Amino acid sequence: MTHDTTSRPSSSRVWRLLLVGSALTAVVGGGMHPDSDASDPLRERLATMTADDQWVLGHAFIVVSTALLALGLRAARQAPGWSPAVRRALTVAAVAVGLYVVETVAHLAAVVDSDALAAGDAAPVAWAHVGLSAVLYPLSGWAIASLALATARGASPLRRVVAGVGLLAGVVHAASIPLMLLLPDLEASRLFPVAAIGIALWTLGTGLLGAPRTAPAGTEVPDRAPQPVT
């Protein structure tokens, strides 16, 4: 008679598939994001982009991508091989990215204010999305950067490279909206695709690599092989 360990590898596959799916949908959605002149005022840029036919579908992919990432990070906490510090960072990141999903939905919904933005009228949904992004971009970005840093400690060289990409992408993501709002002449909106591509690469790399087979010193990794009951 043996213990049933089928749920453990199945759970491991689920979170990794969620992360890979998040990365792929992020690439699709990001590739559909409308362009605008970074030197234009924010209202004008929003009016231009929300009027584009690709806005709704592209941002729908981004909503799905962000939701998959939040679910994947939450599920990854159960994977054997993580240190306690990484598990804590996964918990924080799952919550932060889960909150960031709200911003992506508001971002998508800003399309309802497209005409109002162009006419200079009140655009409550569009500006609500900007307000949410001012809080949730830094929150989710620093959570991702902190998680990437935690996974780099004691990791293999390849995992450190992936973590380095996540650290850089998280910092850029966190800083992009505050810089855009506080220093409009800096044209910080150019940072958005850099952060998006970096996070997608980090997410894909983490999903493909999975959790380490051995935890850092001081932590015990359960044996994944079936054990006989005596």
Region roles according to the model:
Residues T2-T230:
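Hydrophobic, aromatic-enriched alpha-helical segments typical of multi-pass transmembrane helices
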